[in-house]
């Protein structure tokens, strides 16, 4: 099937069917979200997978009582950063350099350029920007879920 056919298959479920999503399909969806492009490569969000029934019930209370929240197999929560701090940006760069086996200082100039660009824009702009980046990842997860017929 093509991407367009997968997306045409996709729909907003109003009632869940009670089936558990197989772990391999969930992993595929999460990997698509992880591989999503983001501005400056920072991925300024975290994706939480929630399947604990008690926690889902609490989330339902603040999600306008939507039954899908409690009836789903897994709930993915995309939590965007509330700002671009030196600590957060450094953590991303350090992780990347560790994965590549390079010294942390390898991309210091680029990291400092990013911080110099984002910091003066203020916390409200930063939070809005991070939220927009999380939407891109969310869209990739939706496309992957459609491909997996979830």
Regions found by a protein language model. Give the residues of each.
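Acidic, surface-exposed loops and disordered segments
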Residues: 1-150
């Amino acid at each position: 099937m093509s991407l367009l056919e997968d997306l045409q298959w996709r729909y907003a479920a109003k009632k869940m069917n009670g089936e558990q999503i197989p772990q391999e399909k969930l992993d595929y969806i999460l990997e698509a979200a992880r591989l999503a492009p983001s501005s400056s490569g920072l991925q300024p969000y975290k994706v939480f997978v929630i399947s604990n029934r008690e926690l889902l019930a609490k989330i339902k209370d603040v999600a306008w009582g939507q039954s899908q929240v409690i009836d789903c197999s897994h709930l993915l929560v995309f939590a965007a950063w509330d700002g671009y701090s030196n600590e957060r940006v450094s953590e991303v760069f350090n992780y990347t350099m560790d994965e590549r086996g390079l010294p942390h200082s390898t991309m210091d100039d680029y990291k400092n350029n990013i911080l110099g660009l984002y910091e003066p824009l203020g916390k409200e702009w930063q939070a809005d920007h991070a939220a927009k980046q999380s939407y891109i990842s969310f869209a990739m997860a939706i496309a992957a879920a459609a491909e997996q017929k979830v």
